[in-house]
């Protein structure tokens, strides 16, 4: 069984559904893939001829998954904290910059400063070394972004989401990607993770 999840402020292109359904079929037996995402927070990413890429970062704005993957997710953040505080977590997350950031976010979740299931879902997939399919062109327009929003106001909207554009004329050749995600993930991290030493000391 599969499910496509669209929140009320996420507007998809017509290509979104074609993309999601094709990827669900292609990766249904690949347990390393946890979800299919419709949004690309860099708006467009073209490092190869493929129409999608594989990333360690999950995007919750228009996505899909399989029942067997979803049922295995542990949403107990206290259990996650034990793992994240373990020095071996660096092997799951890839860099100390990412490690300090995600520890900081998890502590804010445990103090009820952030209320988002998507962060917990990301942590679980980090630990289990699961990945996500991301389209090389964005297929979702989130009309709920702003200072009054529930979650996005805590993110670097000016530098991150301002670049997110809806590609209405997107067409896919469906040339398939390999596990070749380092450059995309690094580009996402360069935007999400502050380069300010003062801000990073807070982590």
Give, region by region, the residue ranges found by the protein language model.
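An acidic/histidine-cluster motif and surrounding catalytic segment
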Residues: 1-5, 10-203
């Amino acid at each position: 069984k599969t499910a496509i999840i669209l929140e009320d402020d996420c507007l998809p292109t017509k290509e979104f559904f074609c993309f999601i359904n094709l990827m669900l079929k292609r990766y249904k037996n690949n347990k390393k893939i946890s979800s299919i995402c419709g949004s690309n927070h860099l708006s467009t990413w073209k490092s190869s001829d493929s129409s999608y890429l594989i990333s360690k970062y999950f995007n919750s704005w228009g996505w899909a998954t399989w029942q067997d993957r979803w049922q295995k997710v542990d949403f107990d953040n206290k259990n996650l904290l034990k793992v994240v505080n373990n020095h071996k977590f660096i092997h799951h997350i890839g860099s100390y910059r990412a490690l300090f950031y995600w520890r900081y976010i998890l502590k804010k979740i445990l103090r009820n400063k952030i209320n988002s299931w998507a962060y917990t879902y990301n942590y679980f997939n980090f630990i289990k070394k699961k990945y996500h399919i991301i389209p090389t062109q964005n297929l979702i327009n989130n009309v709920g972004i702003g200072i009054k929003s529930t979650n996005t106001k805590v993110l670097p909207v000016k530098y991150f989401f301002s670049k997110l554009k809806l590609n209405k004329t997107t067409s896919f050749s469906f040339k398939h990607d390999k596990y070749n995600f380092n450059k995309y993930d690094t580009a996402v991290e360069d935007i999400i993770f502050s380069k300010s030493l003062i801000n990073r000391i807070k982590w």
